[in-house]
Each structure stands twice: as structure tokens, then as C-alpha cells.
């Protein structure tokens, strides 16, 4: 009888221990999947009810340039420049313009450099986003012609109140040194051999001023660009045709009417909509779009984060393009030919 009870207890203990082991393993497995799920979930970028903050810092390029210099990692002077691919930047703006999840787009292009053609494309994309009903708030501490071209497509432009710079979109300039007298004074005889017209490259060594052919070449190049800039800035701000040119030609008079204060002048003539300090801008953004207490400004995502949400869509579109005919292949080449 005792041996029978012992056998029952032994079997019961084994079953009980096995059940506990199974439950323990199940708990470990569920905990593992929960942790992994939390990690993946935290990597997911939420766009609903967010503000897209576009604050690019760098230079816009058609294709980022790679460098393979052996001592690049030991650079101590910080000469490397952040490169932003134009296609990616345009993709962010165009998709954001039709994304109903986003509350608005905040733009600051103070630290962005772009060539004329790239700036015109960015301006077109911002204008299209605004026409699609997306509110765009542009903030700046001061802009020149190309920067203002892009910012002028925003729904609202806010200039930093106490900024030492201002908004001065009044054309292009080209500066060059002419050193003929210098070389004569130091008794250096410069001999330049050139054939044909429009050979202005070496004029810095042979003249003290710009030649008529060099003036003509520069004006032929820059005038169409300036005309396009003016029309887009005027369309973006709702100005009548010719206002940007008038403001540029008469800015000294307009500034004098506002006590020589460039920021007040920009506000008075409509180049910007508001003057605010950064703290006032923060309060204004929170009032318009709301914010949780722990955030310094309305909840939002960066352009890089938003671009990551478009990658899957880009891959599927790329597969479709592979199947299409009559495609044009673009090959970017960099480096020296040896």
C-alpha cells in the first residue's frame, strides 16, 4: 500500500514539475516576442496628427558624392559638407503635400544651399503642396534670393524679430578680382594667348574691369533665371507682376520709410507675414497645432524620418518602372579620368 502511494506521488510530482516547466517556457517565449514587438513598434514612424519639420542643413545635389580618401576619417578641420539628394527632398515634399495625416509642414531653409535649377524645383514642389491644401509655415533668421524663392511658396513666412540678417531677395551678383595693375606694380609680365570671342577666363590677369563680352555673357545667362525667380516669388506671395523688381530697385527708399530697419521693412512691404522671436514662434505653433507638455513644440517628425516611411512605396514603384518601356537611364559619374 505504501509503495503504491509513493508511486502515485512520484508520478504526480513529475507531472506537476513538467507543467511548471511548460508554463515557465511559455512565459519566457511570450516575453521574448513582446520585447521584440516593442522594439519594432518603437522603430515605426507615426505620421498621424504630426507636423513635418523640414530643416535641411547642407547642399542639394542631384546625386550624393562619395569620397574614398584614405585619411578622410582623420580630418580635423571639418571640411565635409552634408549632402542632400534632390530626388529624396522632392519626394518628401510631394508626398507630404497630399498626406492627410500630417497637420502641416514647417520649413526652415536658412542652412540649405541649392543651385538655381534645384531651388526652382523645390519651390515648385512647395507651391504644389500648398495648392493641395497643406499648410506650410516658413521660419527664417534671414534669406537671400535663392533661399527666399523656396520660402516664398509657404502659406506663411515668419522672420525672426531681432535677427541681424533680413529677407533681401533682390537678384544675383558676381564678384571677381582684376589684377592687371597689381602684376605691373610687382614687375610681373603676364602673357595670355586666346583666340575667338568670349574668352573671359583670364581677364582677371589682363584687365582692371569687366569686358563688354563678359558682361553680355553673364547677363545672357542670369537674366532668364532672374525672370523666372521673380515670377515664382510673386506668385508665391500673391504679388502683382513687377513688385519684386520694384522693391529691389527702390529698397533704399522703402527702408528709409521704416527707419532703416530691414526686418520692419520686410514686414511692411509684404515679404514676410510676421515678426517673432523663437519663443513667440514656439507659442504660436503650439497654439495652432497643440503639443504635449513634455515637448518644446508640436509633435512632429523630421524629413529623414518621413522619408523612411516612403521607402516601401518607393520599392514597389521601382518594380513597376522596371517593367515599363522607353525608359531613360541616368548614370552619375564622379572622380577623375586617368
Language-model features: where?
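Short, hydrophobic alpha-helical packing/hinge segments within bilobed ligand-binding/sensory domains
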Residues: 147, 262-263
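A non-catalytic alpha/beta surface segment that caps or lines the substrate-entry region
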Residues: 278-279, 285
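Small-residue-centered hinge/linker elements
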Residues: 2-255, 286-338
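PDZ peptide-recognition modules
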Residues: 237-238, 256, 263, 275
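Short acidic-hydrophobic, aromatic-tinged amphipathic segments that line or gate anion-handling sites
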Residues: 157-159, 272-278
Amino acid at each position: 500500500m505504501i509503495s503504491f502511494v509513493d508511486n502515485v506521488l512520484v508520478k504526480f510530482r513529475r507531472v506537476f514539475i513538467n507543467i511548471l516547466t511548460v508554463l515557465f517556457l511559455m512565459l519566457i517565449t511570450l516575453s521574448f516576442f513582446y520585447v521584440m514587438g516593442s522594439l519594432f513598434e518603437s522603430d515605426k514612424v507615426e505620421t498621424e496628427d504630426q507636423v513635418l519639420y523640414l530643416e535641411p542643413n547642407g547642399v542639394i545635389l542631384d546625386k550624393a558624392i562619395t569620397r574614398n580618401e584614405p585619411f578622410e576619417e582623420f580630418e580635423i578641420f571639418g571640411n565635409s559638407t552634408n549632402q542632400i539628394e534632390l530626388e529624396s527632398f522632392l519626394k518628401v515634399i510631394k508626398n507630404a503635400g497630399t498626406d492627410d495625416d500630417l497637420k502641416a509642414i514647417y520649413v526652415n531653409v536658412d542652412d540649405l544651399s541649392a543651385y538655381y535649377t534645384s531651388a526652382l524645383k523645390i519651390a515648385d514642389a512647395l507651391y504644389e503642396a500648398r495648392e493641395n491644401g497643406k499648410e506650410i509655415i516658413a521660419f527664417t533668421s534671414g534669406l537671400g534670393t535663392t533661399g527666399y524663392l523656396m520660402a516664398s511658396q509657404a502659406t506663411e513666412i515668419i522672420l525672426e524679430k531681432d535677427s541681424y540678417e533680413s529677407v533681401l531677395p533682390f537678384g544675383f551678383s558676381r564678384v571677381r578680382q582684376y589684377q592687371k595693375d597689381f602684376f605691373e606694380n610687382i614687375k610681373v609680365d603676364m602673357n595670355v594667348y586666346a583666340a575667338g570671342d568670349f574668352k573671359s577666363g583670364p581677364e582677371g590677369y589682363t584687365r582692371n574691369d569687366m569686358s563688354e563680352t563678359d558682361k553680355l555673357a553673364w547677363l545672357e545667362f542670369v537674366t532668364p533665371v532672374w525672370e523666372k525667380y521673380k515670377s515664382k516669388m510673386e506668385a508665391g506671395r500673391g504679388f502683382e507682376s513687377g513688385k519684386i523688381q520694384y522693391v529691389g530697385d527702390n529698397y533704399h527708399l522703402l527702408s528709409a520709410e521704416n527707419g532703416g530697419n530691414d526686418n520692419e521693412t520686410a514686414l511692411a512691404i509684404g515679404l514676410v507675414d510676421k515678426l517673432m522671436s523663437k519663443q513667440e514662434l514656439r507659442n504660436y505653433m503650439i497654439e495652432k497645432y497643440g503639443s504635449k507638455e513634455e515637448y518644446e513644440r508640436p509633435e512632429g517628425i523630421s524629413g529623414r524620418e518621413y522619408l523612411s516611411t516612403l521607402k516601401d512605396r518607393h520599392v514597389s514603384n521601382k518594380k513597376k518602372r522596371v517593367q515599363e518601356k522607353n525608359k531613360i537611364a541616368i548614370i552619375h559619374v564622379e572622380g577623375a579620368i586617368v
